[in-house]
C-alpha cells in the first residue's frame, strides 16, 4: 500500500514540537474524539488512540485530562471536523482535515493559503473517488511472527499490514476502526497511534524541484492552527 497517505507527518511533528503547536493539535483531537464517542476511553477506541498519540509525544496527563473534560464544556459544542479538497501544481491532490469552532474563519484561511501558494480549493467531495478512507494504526514491532498477527487481525477487519523499521502499520476500512483496535489490543500489541486517514488510490512522483515548490503550500497548511492533517497523492 505504501505510506503516502499523509504529508511528511514525522518531520512536521518535530517542527510543530519546536513551534509549541503539537500539544494544541493533539488536545483538539482528544476533545473531538471524546465529543463524538464519549469521555470514557474504555468505551471509545478513537479516544484511546488519541490519548496514545498524545502520550507518545510526551503530552502531560493534566493536558490530556483537560482536553477530555473540554468535550463536555460549552466551548466544545461547536467544534466540528471539516474536510477541504484542493489541488496544487504538478498533479498534486490534497485533502485537508480541520477541527474548528469557526468554519467561516477556517475556510477563509484555507482558501487564502491555497491561492497564495499556487493551489486551488476544489468543491467538496471532488477527490472522494481518488482517495479511500481507512483506519490506520501504528504499532511497535511485535515479537511474534508478522504473518500470525496478520491472520489474527483479518477477522477484526484488517485489509493490509506493513512493517517499516520498528513500526508495524495496520490498515482497515474506516468502518472497522473500533473492531480492529479491539483486535490489536486482544493480541497484547501496543497502539502508538490510531487514526482515520485518506489513502490515495494512486500516487505520483515529483522531482526535488517540484517537491520544493509544492512544499511551500503544504507547510502553510500544516502550520494553520485548525488543520489536523494534510493528505496527498505524493509517493
UniProtKB/Swiss-Prot annotation:
Cellular localization per UniProt: Cytoplasm
Chain segments annotated as coiled-coil in the UniProt record: none
GO cellular component: cytosol
Gene Ontology MF terms: DNA binding
Gene3D superfamilies attached to this UniProt entry: 1.10.10.200, 3.30.70.980
Keyword Cell inner membrane attached: no
Any one biological process term the GO annotation gives: regulation of DNA-templated transcription
Domain of life of the native organism: Bacteria
InterPro entries, per database record: Integrase-like_N, TACO1_YebC-like_2nd/3rd_dom, TACO1_YebC_N, Transcrip_reg_TACO1-like, Transcrip_reg_TACO1-like_dom3, YebC-like
Keywords: Cytoplasm, DNA-binding, Transcription, Transcription regulation
Family membership noted in the UniProt record: Belongs to the TACO1 family.
Protein name: Probable transcriptional regulatory protein Ccur92_05350
